[in-house]
Amino acid sequence: MLNFLKIPIDIASNTSYTITRKINNEIGGIYDVDRKTVTNVILGKEVDCVPAGFWFHFPAEQHSGDAAVQAHLDLAKAIDLDMLKIMTESLMPYGDIRCAADWKKLKPFTRQSPFIVEQIDLMKRVCDKLGDDKALLATVHGVWASMFHIFNGPDCYEERRDALAATLREDRDAFRHGLDVVTDGLSLLIDEMKTTGIHGFYYAALGGEANMLSREEFDEVIKPCEIRLLREAKDENHFVMLHMCKDHLDLTRYADYPCDAVNWGIYSDNISLEEGRKLFAGKTILGGLDDRDGVLVHGTKEQIERRVAELMDEMKGYPFILGADCTLPTDIPYDNIRAAIEATRKHAR
């Protein structure tokens, strides 16, 4: 039995976990890995083994509609995942914001806005098929990410993020109007997501890069909106995982965010797992493996197994979910992901 820190939260105590998957490892142990296992780890409760969570963006032709639903179902069938993050590629619309003053023109979103309708349809259909088996996470693109999508579209973030920051500095009042509209729209989205059957939220936060926004800009403008959304997402039936994306992050900006679990890139010039345990004390950590290089992407089964064993020893006694810095390459061999998941069973204590 793995003993973790106790966190005083009660999530879905009356939830029925109807499907349990028993996984035999090479040393004869049998471990139950179900939705409750994932929830218990996130709450810091005792579990038999460490769960794992990995995800990647599907090809463009599988971003929406029937193809997107089938891509999630095929992945769940191909890899016996402990948790499935539903990849929502329907973003806030791009095209109307060209300069700082344009933010004042941004009109409120509604529950019928296409990006909300499309995301909710995908989640409902995936949850209808998988809801009794896997821990299902809804992806929420955070306020800074959504502002960027409206301003520039989904691509070239590193090249264009400073241009977005410049609109904040040029006309803060206009930017705040746009930010309020975006935050209200995400609030509607989160509320609708709770009707789909998901069990938790994966909030993808951008904007914490130390070399982009100042601490004052972040704390005064971005942080209050994110804390509002995280508080709205987190309730007795839904946990919240905070993903802090990109490199050169000032992670202290997120230390008091209301969430149950955290994930960041330890291979991206950010703090280590050990340092993160101190900064995010009491929160479950997901991560440990490089998402773009290293053993998970390029290694052999034996190399992956050794690295997972090292991570489990490093995180012994702390609530931990094996994962990667961020999304994996779309073309990563499924056998590599399977090897990492199987290694958590083999080295369970």
What are these language model-derived features?
Residues 24-59, 66, 71, 82-86, ...:
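Active-site loop segments of alpha/beta catalytic cores
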Residues 64-69, 94-101:
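Glycine-rich loop at the start of a catalytic domain that most often binds anionic cofactors/ligands
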Residues 102-109, 161-162:
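A charged helix-plus-loop insertion that forms the helical arch/lid used to bind
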Residues 1-4, 105, 115:
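Acidic/proline-rich low-complexity IDRs
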Residues 77-95:
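Short N-terminal amphipathic alpha-helices
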Residues 3-13, 17-24:
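Short, positively charged and aromatic/hydrophobic N-terminal segments
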